[in-house]
Amino acid sequence: MNTRSLALALLAGVGAVWTPHTALAGNPLGIDHKLNYDDSGIWKRSYQKQLAVGLALTTIGGALFADNDSRLGRTFDQSLDSMVLTAATTSVMKVAFSRERPSENADPGDFFDGRGHQSFPSGEVAEVTAVVTPFIAEYGDDHPAVWALALLPAYDAVARVKVNGHWQSDVIVGAAIGAAWGVWAHRRHSPLIMGLLPGHGMMIGYARRF
């Protein structure tokens, strides 16, 4: 799998969800505009939270319990690295840029407004992208259906904008960060986080050899 192509494909998937619209001046990518608030159906905020928490718990559980020497176990380890490094990156950027959310201010060009404003970039879209990228990179060629995982960050990106939690550029940059760390983690020969634990991980369970 060409990891550069993977990253571009993920970004294209997130970017493609936006239809042409008159954007307001003063925003980074020239695409930001506030959508009518929609917290109904599949866009409900509670579903977005469940997706983020579910993926995080699945990733942590997979890294802890899967055989670290197996293909699946290594991929979970890579997703864990990607998720944690992505979270660290977006957390720093949120504080540094202190951008107001659409729910707080209708002006997408309002950055550096101080503590408490954390719109840029989207941490949730970044997390979802970071988790799925290593799996797509690892299994995408053998099992093309795995590419369907790219729908998760695309869905989350649309949902975050619909509930006025983020601007369009927030979710696109978030996806870029998650994809970048996901590609980086997949290229590593050994996991970063699980590699620091005794015995190269904490696989729980048992294995039988005949």
Task: Write out the residue ranges for each language-model feature.
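Interfacial segments of alpha-helical transmembrane regions
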Residues: G62-A88
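Hydrophobic alpha-helical transmembrane segments
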Residues: Q48-F65
